[in-house]
């Protein structure tokens, strides 16, 4: 069973990045939206009669069209109740398009090929900020045993919603400008302060703590002009190593140099051994998988040469062995829990 695995290779050495890549402007942020809707047109893969809220929703929808139907008389399996979520970006204007995520609430088997009906998306204040509607595509992958493939009960619809209401902003009149680092780090905060004060020739930045840098706009610049110049300045930066696994697609994203320390773990019927002796020769009963990996079919053990033990190599070898996304996630979590992965592990 093959798993789609993608490796984005990057080095963790120090290099120059723009301030906008490592810090956010406080107050300039996305806002979460949520709504409840119905997906219709499913080929028998929708909610069953046990999902009472779906039947009631269908009845309510038809009643709004002057068609009265008792929820108990509805037997359609071509409809699914869903939650729809979206992010409303800062400064979004009426008519802008938003990407939406549609997720099944009931016992639907798949949303593939369905159509999301008109759904109001509300903010935390209960107001409607966007309207969603459109065709659903789950990526064309069918669900497989063990979690391989995409989740056909959830989908992202690009441009599936229109912004109807704008969030009031007073950025141009705001005199309290602050940067918030995406990853707290005293050195980065100090570097931002030093670079900005040097560029502007006056004290325009003050590092308050490991995450916060207060800004003071020069009188001859507008807020927009000032922040544009601030955010484009380069600083020296060393990114924190990270491994990201997309549970839905099985995609693994890792740096080429994210190493795994010597360890021995067992997951289900697979044993993984990172060989501290750097033995690059196949032992008896072992098959050379290349890239420093050897499989002992008699004990179902994957032995990896320590010099080649990176997250990328381990994921690639597990993929060759037919491991499912769920297996890879569990193995990576166990490696992290054992202290063998020197990077942050994020499951999305």
UniProtKB/Swiss-Prot annotation:
Where does the UniProt annotation locate this protein?
A: Periplasm; Bacterial flagellum basal body
What keywords appear on the UniProt entry?
Bacterial flagellum, Periplasm, Signal
Recorded GO MF terms: structural molecule activity
Biological process terms from the Gene Ontology for this record are: bacterial-type flagellum-dependent cell motility
Tell me yes or no: is ATP-binding among this UniProt entry's keywords: no
**InterPro entries noted in UniProt:** Flag_FlgI
What's the domain of life for this entry?
A: Bacteria
Q: Which GO terms describe its cellular component?
A: bacterial-type flagellum basal body, distal rod, P ring; outer membrane-bounded periplasmic space
Q: Where is the signal peptide?
A: 1-16
Q: Does the keyword Signal apply?
A: yes
Its subunit composition reads: The basal body constitutes a major portion of the flagellar organelle and consists of four rings (L,P,S, and M) mounted on a central rod.
**What does this chain do?**
Assembles around the rod to form the L-ring and probably protects the motor/basal body from shearing forces during rotation.
In the record, the note on similarity to other proteins reads: Belongs to the FlgI family.
What NCBIfam families does UniProt report for this protein, alphabetically?
PRK05303.1
Q: What is this protein called?
A: Flagellar P-ring protein
Organism of origin: Campylobacter jejuni subsp. doylei (strain ATCC BAA-1458 / RM4099 / 269.97)
The major lineage groups are: Bacteria, Pseudomonadati, Campylobacterota, Epsilonproteobacteria, Campylobacterales
């Amino acid at each position: 069973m093959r798993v789609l695995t993608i490796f984005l290779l990057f080095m963790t050495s120090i290099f120059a990045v723009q301030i906008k890549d490592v810090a956010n402007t406080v107050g300039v942020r996305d806002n979460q939206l949520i709504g409840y809707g119905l997906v219709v047109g499913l080929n028998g893969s929708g909610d069953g009669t046990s999902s009472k809220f779906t039947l009631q929703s269908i009845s309510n929808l038809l009643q709004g069209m002057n068609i009265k139907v008792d929820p108990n008389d509805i037997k359609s399996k071509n409809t699914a109740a869903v939650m729809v979520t979206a992010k409303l970006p800062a400064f979004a204007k009426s008519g802008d398009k938003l990407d939406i995520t549609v997720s099944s609430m009931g016992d639907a088997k798949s949303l593939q090929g369905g159509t999301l009906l008109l759904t109001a998306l509300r903010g935390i204040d209960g107001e409607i900020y966007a309207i969603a509607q459109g065709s659903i595509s789950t990526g064309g992958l069918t669900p497989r045993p063990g979690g391989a493939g995409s989740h056909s009960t959830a989908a992202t619809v690009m441009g599936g919603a229109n912004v109807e209401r704008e969030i009031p902003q007073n950025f141009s009149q705001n005199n309290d400008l602050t940067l918030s680092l995406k990853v707290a780090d005293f050195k980065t905060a100090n570097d931002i302060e030093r670079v900005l004060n040097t560029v502007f020739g006056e004290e325009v930045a003050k590092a308050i703590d490991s995450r916060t840098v207060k800004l003071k706009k020069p009188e001859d610049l507008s807020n927009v002009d000032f922040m544009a110049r601030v955010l484009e300045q380069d600083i020296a930066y060393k990114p924190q190593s990270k491994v990201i696994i997309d549970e839905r697609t099985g995609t693994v994203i890792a740096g080429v140099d994210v190493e795994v320390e010597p360890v021995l773990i067992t997951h289900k019927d697979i044993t993984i051994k990172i060989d501290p002796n750097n033995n690059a020769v196949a032992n008896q009963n072992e098959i050379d998988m290349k890239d420093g990996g050897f499989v002992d079919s008699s004990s179902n053990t994957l032995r990896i040469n320590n010099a080649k033990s990176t997250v990328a190599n381990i994921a690639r070898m597990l993929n060759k062995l037919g491991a499912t996304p769920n297996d890879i996630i569990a193995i990576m979590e166990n490696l992290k829990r054992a202290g063998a992965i020197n990077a942050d592990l994020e499951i999305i």
